[in-house]
């Protein structure tokens, strides 16, 4: 596994936390200091904790486990989606629907509806409907695709949850906790680290930082080396 680079993290701004007035005191152990009223994250700790998280993620991937990537901030949507798709994993990148994990039976019914609509749009069924009916069904299809498209082939609950930010994705984290699903998360200085099994202290706002985390994760869980190990 490639060694994490302090230089790359500095260049991506991983060390920049939030303004000190917005901090969560529970993040104190991961803070190096203050610069211009902004908390600076201790990257030595980030490297150690990220490395530990990567070891566990690799184990899950080697065991053919399902990893659900969650990032619903506008800036992270495309990166979350592309990382999951490249690695043959799953994602939620628009809105986390309450009960997405804890009420999987209902979600499964919605996924069935999504797949039915996809089939109808391709098998000529829509051609037999009025323009108004097609418009209504297309709207439903787009809405379901945005919400569930990234998990429609997951086939059950994931084996791990990876979130690109703890504050934004707190509902997903809480649901995973209640089901005993291990949680891996980027945690900024304004966030509550409770309930996160593998804390990765770091900037969760800068797109360069998010892309760096995701590139590192994808290199570990869907590398050629990993594929060789699983065959």
Curated annotation (Swiss-Prot):
Record-linked PROSITE patterns: RIBOSOMAL_S2_1
GO cellular component: cytosolic small ribosomal subunit
Biological process per Gene Ontology, one example term: translation
Molecular function per GO: structural constituent of ribosome
InterPro entries: Ribosomal_uS2, Ribosomal_uS2_bac/mit/plastid, Ribosomal_uS2_CS, Ribosomal_uS2_flav_dom_sf
Alphabetical keyword list: Ribonucleoprotein, Ribosomal protein
Alphabetical list of Pfam families matching this protein: Ribosomal_S2 (PF00318)
Family statement drawn from the similarity comment of this UniProt entry: Belongs to the universal ribosomal protein uS2 family.
The protein's name: Small ribosomal subunit protein uS2
Species, as recorded: Blochmanniella floridana
């Amino acid at each position: 596994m490639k060694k994490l680079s302090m230089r790359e993290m500095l260049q991506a701004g991983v060390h920049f936390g939030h303004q000190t007035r917005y901090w969560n005191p529970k993040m104190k152990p991961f803070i190096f200091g203050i610069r211009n009223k902004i908390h600076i994250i201790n990257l030595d700790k980030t490297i150690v904790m990220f490395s530990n998280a990567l070891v566990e993620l690799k184990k899950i991937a080697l065991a053919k486990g399902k990893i659900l990537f969650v990032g619903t901030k506008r800036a992270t949507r495309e990166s979350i989606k592309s990382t999951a798709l490249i690695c043959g994993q799953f994602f939620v990148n628009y809105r986390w629907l309450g009960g997405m994990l804890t009420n999987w039976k209902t979600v499964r019914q919605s996924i069935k509806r999504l797949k039915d609509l996809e089939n109808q749009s391709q098998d000529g069924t829509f051609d037999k409907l009025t323009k108004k009916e097609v418009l209504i069904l297309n709207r439903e299809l787009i809405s379901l695709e945005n919400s569930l498209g990234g998990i429609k082939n997951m086939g059950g609950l994931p084996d791990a949850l990876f979130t690109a930010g703890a504050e934004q994705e707190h509902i997903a984290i809480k649901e995973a906790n209640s089901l005993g699903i291990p949680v891996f998360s980027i945690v900024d200085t304004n966030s509550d680290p409770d309930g996160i099994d593998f804390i990765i202290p770091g900037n969760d706002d800068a797109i360069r930082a998010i892309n760096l985390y995701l590139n590192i994760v994808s290199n570990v869980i869907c590398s050629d080396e990993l594929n060789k190990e699983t065959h």
